UniProtKB/Swiss-Prot annotation:
Keyword tags: Cell membrane, Membrane, Repeat, Transmembrane, Transmembrane helix, Transport
GO MF term set: monoatomic cation transmembrane transporter activity
Cellular component aspect of the GO annotation: plasma membrane
InterPro entries: AAE_transporter, RCK_C, RCK_C_sf, Transpt_YidE_put, YidE_YbjL
Stated name of the protein: Putative transport protein YidE
Domain RCK C-terminal positions: 191-276, 279-361
């Protein structure tokens, strides 16, 4: 059997064993995708015992490509909602994540001094305990720059391998323990997150109000200050028994009923200056109007602002709201359309059909993947991650690496949406498939590399001590911050799990958190919110610790 065939066969075996382990559940809790790591350790042990040798270069390429696929698809998924989330809750989430990094560094320093753990070993334990491969590489590089013998530098890799599996378990255990301590109902948490999903802080709502302010009588909608901006859309007007689609020039009169779409605070202000909310229905049933959801798939309208399409003037159709990657937005005229945007249209059937033709509304296109933007995004992400950042006083340049670069680039491209006819929308099913493939490849290789010497180090060496130290570095910061976040900040459980996973830059933990409620994007969003800053901190922390410990002896 050729080397390639052998490697692929071993990887397939690891995936089968690992996914089987991950599907085994105890009281509803399982390792999920994290089981692949243990499958790799098991298979790696027997591969080593059998004397088989796999190409280290090939394994390294597969491992890094798997990681790139995973973080890139995560970024594309959460990109559209990432920056809105950052404005609303990003500061709080990042503060908690930074606190986890700081506490982890303090625990590492205390263990190093108390138990006189060799510097390469403690840095490897730290990197494995926080499940951060770039931290391992950064630590090894700084040790080489400081003149540490190669045999000592290699110890960092072994201690990393010992701490890494239990680092993942520690994160999963912390999530499970916090769920038990606070008696969390995951379904309730998902509903609460969905009800509080925001765009600049508020969920989009609709109300019907009656024009009661005499100062608004016989005014055009565009002359009413609260209605002439982009914060509120007036999508329907009912006068006596006639329902119509209003335009900015439509004159409103006392007694008219207006159907308004906007954020709660803005709608409240509208009531103050126009009139009170009423229970009267402004349904289109039984009228010559209808409401329909249409998806943007026509490449010719991508990047164009809603106001520039002149749907009201040309077709007498109003866009009442816009859904982008699950985030509800007020359809203001300045919003540029992206592929996959879902628009609520109000108008006559023939007019809506005409607008749908302009927008595309080709459902089959939503199932197609444009591969060119995928590889452009991955390539740009790798380039971004390879840019060295020179910090005064550091003997080695800092980099985002193959994990941070593609993630940040994907977040940016996901937010931009499209450039010309290139669009970075990815069907959810395709995104999930690439994401799962990437994480399976990554964990399979990590497990295989750890499996050969894992048992010997565990039984005959200092492996148990290293695991214990790693468990402390993993658990103490996570449990401390998890309790603080839940008790003091009243943080949503799913959001907290994503933050904990992101603070450890741990894809398997994110996969586990996502599986707690597959239809909620809370964990992925908070993960991506803290990941960029934490990745940078995780890369420089072992370098800071190395320089600190080296200088004080």
């Amino acid at each position: 059997m050729s080397d390639i065939a052998l490697t692929v066969s071993i990887l397939a075996l690891v995936a089968v064993v690992g996914l089987f382990i991950g599907n085994v559940k105890f009281r509803g809790i399982g390792l999920g995708i994290g089981g692949v790591l243990f499958g790799g350790i098991i298979v790696g042990h027997f591969v080593s015992q059998a004397g088989m040798t796999l190409s280290s270069d090939m394994l390294h390429v597969i491992q890094e490509f798997g990681l790139i696929l995973f973080v890139y698809t995560i970024g594309i998924q959460v990109g559209p909602g990432f920056f809105a989330s950052l404005r609303v809750s990003g500061l709080r989430l990042n503060l908690f994540a930074v606190l986890i990094v700081i506490i982890g560094g303090l625990v590492t320093a205390i263990l190093h001094k108390l138990f006189d753990i060799p510097l390469p070993v403690v840095l490897g334990i730290f990197s494995g305990a926080v499940t951060n491969t770039p931290a391992l590489g950064a630590g090894q590089q700084i040790l080489r720059d400081l003149g540490t013998p190669m045999e000592m530098v290699d110890q960092m890799g072994m201690s990393y391998a010992m701490a890494y599996p239990f680092g993942i378990c520690g994160i999963l255990f912390t999530m499970w323990m916090l769920r038990v301590i606070f008696r969390v109902n995951v379904e309730t948490e998902a509903q609460q997150h969905e009800s509080s999903r925001t765009n600049a802080g508020a969920l989009i709502k609709t109300i019907n109000i009656r024009v009661e302010n005499p100062n608004r009588h016989d005014l055009a909608i565009k002359d009413v200050p609260i209605l002439n901006g982009d914060k509120i859309i007036c999508s329907r007007l009912k006068r006596e028994e006639t329902l119509k689609v209003p335009s900015p020039d439509t004159i409103i009169q006392l007694g008219d009923l207006l159907h308004l779409v906007g954020q709660p605070a803005d709608l409240h202000n509208a009531q103050l200056v126009i009139g009170q909310e009423v229970d009267t229905s402004l349904s289109t049933k039984g009228t010559d109007l209808r409401v329909e959801r249409v998806v943007v798939t026509n490449e010719n309208v991508l990047g164009k602002r809603i106001r520039d399409l002149h749907f009201k003037e040309r077709y007498d159709v109003v866009i009442s709201r816009l859904n982008r990657a699950g985030v509800e937005l007020v359809a203001s005229g300045d919003i540029s359309l992206q592929f996959g945007d879902i628009l609520n249209l109000v108008g006559r059937p023939s007019a809506i059909d005409a607008v749908a033709n302009v927008l595309g509304n080709a459902q089959q296109k939503l199932q197609q993947v444009q591969m060119l933007p995928v590889f452009i995004g991955i390539g740009l992400g790798v380039l971004l991650g390879s840019i060295p950042v020179f910090v005064p006083g550091f003997p080695a340049a800092l980099k985002l690496g193959l994990a941070g670069g593609p993630l940040i680039m994907a977040l940016i491209l996901g937010r931009i949406g499209s450039i010309g006819k290139l669009y970075w929308f990815m069907p959810p099913s395709a995104n999930l498939a690439l994401r799962e493939l990437g994480i399976v490849l990554f964990l399979s290789i990590v497990g295989l590399k750890s499996g050969g010497d894992f048992v010997n180090t565990l039984v005959n060496g200092e492996g148990l001590s290293w695991i214990g130290y790693g468990a402390l570095i993993t658990a103490v910061p996570l449990i401390t911050v998890g309790i603080l976040a839940r008790m003091l900040a009243k943080m949503n459980y799913l959001t907290m799990c994503g933050m904990l996973a992101g603070s450890m830059t741990d894809p398997p933990a994110l996969a586990f958190a996502n599986n707690l409620h597959p239809t909620s994007g809370a964990a992925a969003l908070s993960y991506a919110t803290v990941y960029p800053l934490v990745m940078f901190l995780r890369i420089i922390t072992p370098q800071l610790l190395a320089v600190l410990f080296w200088s004080i002896g």
